[in-house]
Amino acid sequence: MEIAVEREEENYLELRIQGEDHTLGNLIAGRLRSVKGVILATYYLPHPLKDELVIKIKTDGTISPREALNRAIEDVKVLGESFLDELEQV
């Protein structure tokens, strides 16, 4: 996985991630939408034959896009740990 900042402003962040597809894009964008202060969280694949995605994050100014991304990633980590804990109970 290789991550590059395509565009960054005070309330906007656009990342290009090499080697990933809808799986990561949907997971991160979905979690970002639940972070308070995020007004846009989306992703797209620039080309269907390349493993590459672009994530766009826009906030209302109460939180930075990078902080929102960090919170979303933490949520994903907690979700994964919870899933593993539940799986061990089965």
From Swiss-Prot:
GO biological process, one term: DNA-templated transcription
Superkingdom of origin organism: Archaea
Main location: cytoplasm
InterPro entries: RBP11-like, RBP11-like_dimer, RNA_pol_Rpb11_13-16kDa_CS, Rpo11-like
GO cellular component terms given for this protein: cytoplasm; DNA-directed RNA polymerase complex
Pfam families attached to this UniProt entry: RNA_pol_L_2
One function term, GO molecular function aspect: DNA-directed RNA polymerase activity
Keyword Nucleotidyltransferase listed: yes
Entry EC no(s): 2.7.7.6
Localization annotation: Cytoplasm
Keyword Transcription: yes
Reactions mediated catalytically: RNA(n) + a ribonucleoside 5'-triphosphate = RNA(n+1) + diphosphate
Keywords: Cytoplasm, DNA-directed RNA polymerase, Nucleotidyltransferase, Transcription, Transferase
Record PANTHER family: DNA-DIRECTED RNA POLYMERASE I,II,III (PTHR13946), DNA-DIRECTED RNA POLYMERASES I AND III SUBUNIT RPAC2 (PTHR13946:SF28)
Family that this chain belongs to: Belongs to the archaeal Rpo11/eukaryotic RPB11/RPC19 RNA polymerase subunit family.
Subunit and partners: Part of the RNA polymerase complex.
Function: DNA-dependent RNA polymerase (RNAP) catalyzes the transcription of DNA into RNA using the four ribonucleoside triphosphates as substrates.
Name of this protein: DNA-directed RNA polymerase subunit Rpo11
Species for this entry: Metallosphaera sedula (strain ATCC 51363 / DSM 5348 / JCM 9185 / NBRC 15509 / TH2)
Gene that produces this protein: rpo11
